[in-house]
């Protein structure tokens, strides 16, 4: 016949297994390949947008690794808490244990977190390096944050005029069949399968130039030039926004971004 201690251990193990099964079943049902949409948020979506660049591919991979690690930690901690609450409750232990330490446990809870942090840190550092080091680029774009819009320049193309992307109001967005608070009156256009450098700054408030499908979020700071790069791996329309709470009309600073095919670079 099983002892109370064995029953408690079994119960805690069941809790851990159920938690893990529910977590990974949810992952299997919803998928970890990105929210399927035209480069914009999906109603009811909870996951990252579908990747449209090599950098976002790596962001998604790192996110997935961390998600699995966190899920395993949650299942383990929940099972451990249940085990402790039942096994070491006052009724089962009228005389408290006077154990002061356990060398093996202390080694485990020191070494295991270090291993977990290394598993997370190594790919994260590689990703940060990949994002920060601007590769050989064929197109350069300068984005200047204003109140409350983005102004774009093509420094390498003197024959291309600068323009300001203004947000569409609710009526204009509805008539154009575009998402309100995401669409603008003028798209930023760059070719697909091309390394593009983005130079970002601001004339007034701090902003953040963000395109989730490309894994880009870079601060626009007055008097400072920041830069990053991306490579659109497929054609389409991708929406972004300012991700820095910059003032009263922060919600109006939108990005509408399209990637034509190489033959349409014109």
Model feature map: region roles:
Residues 70:
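Active-site-proximal cofactor/substrate-binding loop regions of enzyme domains
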Residues 3-18, 106:
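Alpha-helical transmembrane segments and their helix-start/interface "positive-inside/aromatic belt" motifs
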Residues 74-87:
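Alpha-helical transmembrane segments
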Residues 14-29:
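Hydrophobic alpha-helical membrane-insertion segments
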Residues 3, 27-66, 85-259, 263-265:
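Non-transmembrane, membrane-proximal soluble domains of secreted or membrane proteins
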């Amino acid at each position: 016949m099983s002892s109370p201690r064995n029953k408690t251990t079994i119960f805690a193990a069941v809790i851990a297994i159920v938690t893990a099964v529910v977590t990974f079943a949810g992952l299997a049902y919803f998928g970890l390949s990105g929210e399927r949409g035209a480069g914009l948020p999906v109603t009811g979506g909870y996951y990252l947008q579908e990747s449209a660049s090599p950098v976002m591919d790596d962001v998604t991979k790192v996110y997935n690794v961390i998600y699995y690690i966190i899920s395993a930690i949650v299942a383990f901690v929940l099972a451990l808490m249940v085990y402790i609450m039942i096994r070491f409750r006052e009724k089962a232990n009228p005389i408290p244990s006077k154990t002061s330490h356990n060398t093996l446990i202390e080694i485990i809870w020191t070494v295991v977190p270090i291993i977990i942090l290394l598993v997370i840190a190594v790919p994260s550092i590689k990703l940060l390096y990949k994002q920060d080091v601007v590769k050989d680029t064929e197109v350069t774009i300068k984005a200047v944050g204003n109140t409350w819009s983005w102004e774009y320049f093509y420094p390498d193309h003197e024959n291309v005029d600068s323009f300001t992307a203004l947000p569409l109001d609710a009526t204009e967005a509805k008539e154009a069949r575009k998402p309100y608070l995401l669409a603008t009156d003028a798209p930023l256009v760059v070719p697909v399968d091309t390394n593009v450098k983005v130079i970002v700054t601001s004339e007034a408030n701090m902003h953040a130039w963000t395109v989730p499908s490309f894994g880009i979020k870079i601060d626009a700071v007055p008097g400072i030039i920041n830069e990053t790069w991306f490579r659109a791996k497929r054609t389409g329309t991708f929406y972004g926004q300012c991700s820095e709470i910059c003032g009263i009309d922060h919600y109006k600073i939108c990005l509408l971004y399209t990637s034509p095919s190489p033959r349409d670079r014109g």
